[in-house]
Design a protein with these regions (language model features):
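N-terminal catalytic cores of NTP/NDP-binding nucleotidyl/phosphoryl-transfer enzymes
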Residues: 10-73
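Phosphate/ribose-recognition catalytic cores of enzymes acting on nucleotide-derived substrates
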Residues: 144, 195-286
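Short acidic-hydrophobic, aromatic-tinged amphipathic segments that line or gate anion-handling sites
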Residues: 2-9
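A glycine-rich helix N-cap at a beta->alpha junction
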Residues: 73-90
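Residue-level signal for inorganic ion chemistry
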Residues: 28, 81, 118, 178, ...
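Classical nucleotidyltransferase
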Residues: 100-205
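Glycine-rich, highly charged phosphate/nucleotide-binding loops
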Residues: 69-77, 99-107
Length: 286
């Protein structure tokens, strides 16, 4: 997968392509529907699949105090795009220059690429102040011999699948429902930190991850059925998110995972913990 991080570098990609456009901050089923539609069209016409998105949430510039917690780290997002078969990722910083482009100026810059089709969700907007919409894209497509595919929003019964809805589910600990909307288990990745190592003393060695709750979505305090991935292997386990009430003097919130059928040393190693179901709230053991 080729990654371009600047509008000024778009000219370096010269192959015919189909572009899916969106914030794609959660890569949930709605986002996958847009990208999947673009992929299908690209395959049918022998063209490359391109995705245009932002490396930072637009609100980080417009209203920093309202920036939502992330559902994916940049590394996770790139891995997901690659797994979906994206050939070209346009991962563009949302900065003042981009925010001030009119819809027409944005499309003019995008027009450097040789695309035959644009694919968006029905609520897509772009350009300064979000002035560009489906009508804008329709007029552009008609005037530039380009196909426009507009995908309807994807719903779970009466609920529209959205990153906001998924954030609420994760915050409430409803990771099973979030898993359905995402089309995958919600996961956290990080380096195992060295804790007090008391788990070893009571016969249940654990891996600990410090949580940056201000930056990435963290499930509510409780115990979860999880799967743990590292070194190309997968293990089942039980994860506890909370303030470690068993050891009352420990105040920092962490994810503590008991990995079944594993007794190795994971300190300083990178692991990914996928959440499948909330078992119960956090309980202090006497």
């Amino acid at each position: 997968m080729i990654v371009i991080r600047s509008l000024e570098q778009l000219h370096t990609f010269t192959e015919p392509c189909v572009i899916a456009l969106g914030t794609f901050d959660g890569l949930h089923l709605g986002h996958k529907d847009v990208i999947g539609s673009a992929k299908e069209y690209a395959q049918q016409h022998g063209e490359r699949l391109a995705v245009f998105t932002f490396s930072n949430h637009p609100l980080s510039l417009i209203k920093p105090e309202l920036v939502p917690v992330a559902l994916l780290s940049q590394e996770q997002k790139h891995a997901c795009f690659e797994a979906m078969g994206v050939d070209l990722l346009l991962d563009i910083p949302f900065n003042e220059a981009l925010a001030n482009l009119s819809p027409q100026e944005f499309l003019q810059k995008l027009g450097v690429l040789k695309f035959s089709c644009l694919v968006v969700g029905e609520n897509f907007s772009f350009g300064k102040g979000g002035a560009g919409n489906i009508q804008t894209l329709t007029a552009f497509a008609q005037g530039n011999n380009c196909k426009l595919i507009v995908r309807p929003l994807v719903s779970d019964d009466a609920t529209v699948i959205s990153s906001t809805a998924i954030r609420h589910l994760i915050a409430a600990g409803e990771v099973a429902k979030a898993r359905y909307m995402l089309g995958r288990a919600y996961s956290l990745s990080g380096t195992v930190v060295r804790g007090a190592q008391r788990g070893n003393k009571i016969g249940f060695p654990t891996a600990n991850l410090a949580l940056e709750a201000a930056k990435i979505a963290v499930p509510s305090i409780g115990v979860y059925a999880v799967k743990v991935y590292f070194d190309g292997k997968c293990y089942k386990g039980m994860g506890n998110i909370g303030n470690n009430p068993t050891f009352g003097e420990l105040k920092e919130a962490r994810l503590e995972v008991n990995i079944f059928d594993f007794d190795g040393d994971l300190y300083d190693k990178e692991i990914t913990v996928a959440f499948y179901e909330r078992i119960r709230g956090e309980v202090k053991f006497n």
